[in-house]
């Protein structure tokens, strides 16, 4: 067909429909020619050479091209893998700025690779492939970006009021009985009133979604075993929502559906945080396919080994690392982040393996260009930024090292709280730090307790139920002979591996689940709950379900009584936290009086009621401790400048196996007060019938349990 090509504009990158036609623009520094490829409904291809190039941006405007048009690029240039160049115009490439993508990667043959499969393994990536792959790869889509937000804005929930719920778009609703079957596992499924009602009743304020950037499942390795890339940590584009989660269509309808989901969640008071993977792409190492950035300009977008540019630096364990040091790569990331905030109304981001983004040359640098440009951006200054503060490279564990404006997944919190409740020695001091927001990690560079994203479980590892039911991972279903997944789970099965009908073991496991949830919700910092933990979700001991798109990963909404009780206990905990600012302070504890009174804002005690000494923190076998939190000593005023006060509380932690009698503290007159029992984790719910402890009474705390008392005035 005849297509009239106008010169068009350099910006914006990608495809942009102006109501009369569409502008196309692609950055490639080393290309010698670029072809725009249009596809009709029958997949017939029309190629149009982009003749205009300015500042390495190839561009053109096509009148009459409208939303729903599918397209891709073929990029010509040198095939010199030893020098890092892997141009091959036989490969149709996804537009890195495409706002929608139609279709999934199909087939498992040699066509999608830039090199030939006809040579020996050690040399095959050096030989140019003559095979065309347009019939196998997803197509970019022109979209109309207009949407009636009806006044919707970012919620800007204060950090100290935030409760995060991490979940998977498909897994959360795939089996929900009250959601129409055609909507389950989709953006529309999350927007359904039944899904939102569950989150609202829990008290969730922020939904953290596992990757929704369009990702690929490479054919072969997983698909040959009947598995797939379920988690989605192999992005192939950073603007398009994954089309596989759309109930309405894949020619731009998925964008509208995603926006409708965000709007529905915002109306319910729930923010949307995206798990984003800017550290690598799904193209893998030198033996991976050419689907987008590799074929567009490999030396620009990826970090290559200096003395052998055929190979890729890999700080992620996924075969490649984006070269964030190049201005165009930084621009790609920043344009993507701004797009999701301004066009999709997303409230924040969790950066997967964020340390990889801060590497300059080889070392992680908290003053890197990535942080500089993030901190200067007025759009991103208003959203939540969360780092997974590590990568797989040398020196990659950076917990506590990120700069201001950033919160971090606190991996030390997870490890310490797990160790404490399984009865490990020498954990008291670390546990106390973690319970108070980890000031030893986050207070030194000007950050506050909200820098610590506290979690006990996350998508990567055991669920809460499995944490107290398995001591070893059981990943046989992944097809890797149980060799994948972390061996160091800090878990305890309570005496039997896996399922059991022993009532004592079941009672202990239920108590431990409540201990973990109560510790999480009553700690300073920001709690993150793994979706499904509130209802006892199990993965049968699999701690790495990245490839399990089945009932092993999907939520089971048919709950027994124990799990119904756990849901209600979790609701009560979250409501309690939201009612009491003493558990979500905006400033650090001082360990001294703040408003001139004789009682410190926090005091730690032995079970006998005496104050902890420096020496006692180092008693390795001690596994029981008490803490007093003074609600009259809150350092931050209300938004109107008024002084805030709260109730005061005593908490008793007993990680020993036997019951311990705790005496009420004998200092500051605390033994002269009456105390009301609020939580005892040996019970399935919050205490309903009032139980009062007076000064001469000891408080029995059964083994492996937590008790919370409220001071009566």
What is each residue range found by the language model?
Residues 69, 77-79, 171-176, 203-211, ...:
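A generic secondary-structure signal for well-formed alpha-helical elements
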Residues 345, 366-531, 536, 544-548, ...:
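Conserved alpha/beta catalytic core and glycan-binding cleft of carbohydrate-active enzymes
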Residues 1-165, 170, 500, 506-512, ...:
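Carbohydrate-interacting/catalytic domains
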């Amino acid at each position: 067909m005849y297509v009239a090509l106008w010169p068009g504009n350099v910006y914006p990158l990608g495809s942009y429909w102006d109501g009369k036609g569409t502008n196309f623009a692609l950055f490639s520094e080393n290309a010698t020619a670029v072809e725009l490829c249009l596809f009709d409904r029958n997949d017939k291809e029309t190629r149009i050479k982009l003749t205009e190039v300015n500042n390495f941006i190839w561009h053109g405007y096509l009148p009459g091209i409208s939303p729903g048009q599918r397209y891709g690029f073929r990029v010509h240039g040198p095939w010199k893998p030893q020098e890092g160049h892997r141009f091959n115009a036989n490969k149709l490439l996804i537009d890195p700025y495409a706002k929608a993508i139609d279709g999934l990667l199909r087939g498992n043959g040699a066509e999608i690779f830039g090199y030939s499969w006809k040579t020996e393994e050690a040399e095959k990536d050096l030989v140019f492939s003559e095979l065309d792959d347009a019939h196998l790869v997803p197509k970019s889509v022109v979209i109309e970006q207009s949407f009636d937000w009806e006044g919707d804005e970012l919620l800007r929930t204060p950090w100290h009021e935030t409760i995060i719920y991490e979940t998977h778009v498909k897994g959360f609703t795939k089996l929900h009985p009250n959601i129409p079957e055609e909507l389950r596992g989709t953006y529309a499924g999350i927007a359904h009133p039944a899904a939102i009602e569950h989150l609202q009743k829990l008290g969730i304020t922020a939904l953290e979604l596992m990757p929704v950037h369009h990702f690929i499942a490479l054919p072969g390795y997983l698909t040959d075993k009947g598995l797939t890339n379920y988690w989605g940590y192999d992005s192939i584009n950073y603007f398009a929502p994954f089309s596989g989660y759309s109930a309405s269509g894949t020619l731009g309808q998925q964008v509208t559906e995603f926006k409708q989901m965000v709007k529905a969640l915002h109306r319910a008071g729930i923010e949307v945080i995206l798990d984003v993977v800017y550290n690598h792409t799904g193209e893998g190492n030198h033996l991976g396919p050419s689907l987008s950035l590799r074929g567009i300009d490999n030396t620009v977008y990826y970090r290559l080994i200096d003395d052998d540019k055929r190979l890729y630096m890999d700080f992620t364990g996924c075969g490649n690392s984006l070269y964030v040091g190049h201005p165009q790569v930084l621009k790609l990331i920043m344009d993507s982040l701004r797009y999701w905030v301004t066009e999709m109304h997303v409230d924040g981001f969790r950066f997967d393996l964020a340390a990889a983004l801060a590497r300059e040359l080889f070392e992680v640098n908290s003053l890197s260009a990535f942080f500089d440009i993030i901190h200067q951006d007025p759009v991103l200054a208003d959203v939540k930024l969360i780092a997974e503060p590590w990568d797989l490279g040398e020196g990659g564990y950076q917990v506590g090292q990120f700069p201001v404006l950033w919160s971090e997944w606190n991996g030390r919190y997870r490890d310490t709280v797990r160790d404490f409740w399984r009865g490990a020695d020498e954990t008291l001091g670390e546990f106390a730090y973690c319970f108070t927001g980890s000031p030893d990690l986050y207070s030194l560079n000007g950050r506050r307790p909200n820098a610590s994203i506290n979690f006990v479980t996350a998508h990567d590892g055991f669920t809460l139920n499995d944490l107290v039911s398995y001591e070893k991972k059981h990943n046989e279903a992944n097809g890797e002979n149980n060799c994948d997944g972390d061996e160091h789970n800090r878990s305890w099965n309570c005496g039997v591996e896996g399922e059991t009908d022993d009532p004592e073991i079941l009672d202990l496991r239920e108590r431990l689940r409540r201990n973990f949830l109560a510790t999480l919700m009553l700690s300073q910092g920001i709690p993150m709950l793994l979706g499904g933990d509130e209802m006892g979700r199990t993965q049968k001991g699999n701690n790495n379900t990245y490839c399990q798109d089945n009932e092993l990963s999907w939520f089971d909404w048919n709950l027994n009584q124990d799990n119904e009780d756990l849901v209600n206990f979790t609701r009560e905990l979250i409501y309690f936290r939201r009612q009491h600012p003493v558990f979500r302070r905006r400033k650090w504890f001082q360990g001294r009086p703040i408003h001139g009174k004789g009682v410190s804002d926090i005091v730690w005690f032995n079970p006998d009621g005496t104050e902890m000494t420096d020496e006692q923190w180092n008693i390795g076998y001690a596994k029981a401790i008490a803490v007093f939190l003074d609600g009259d000593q809150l350092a931050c005023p209300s938004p109107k400048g008024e002084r805030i006060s709260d109730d005061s509380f005593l908490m008793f932690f007993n990680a020993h196996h036997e019951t311990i009698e705790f005496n009420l503290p004998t200092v500051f007159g605390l033994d002269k007060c009456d105390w009301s029992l609020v939580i005892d984790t040996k019970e399935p719910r919050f205490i309903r019938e009032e139980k009062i402890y007076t000064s001469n009474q000891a408080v029995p705390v059964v083994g492996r349990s937590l008790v919370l008392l409220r001071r009566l005035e």
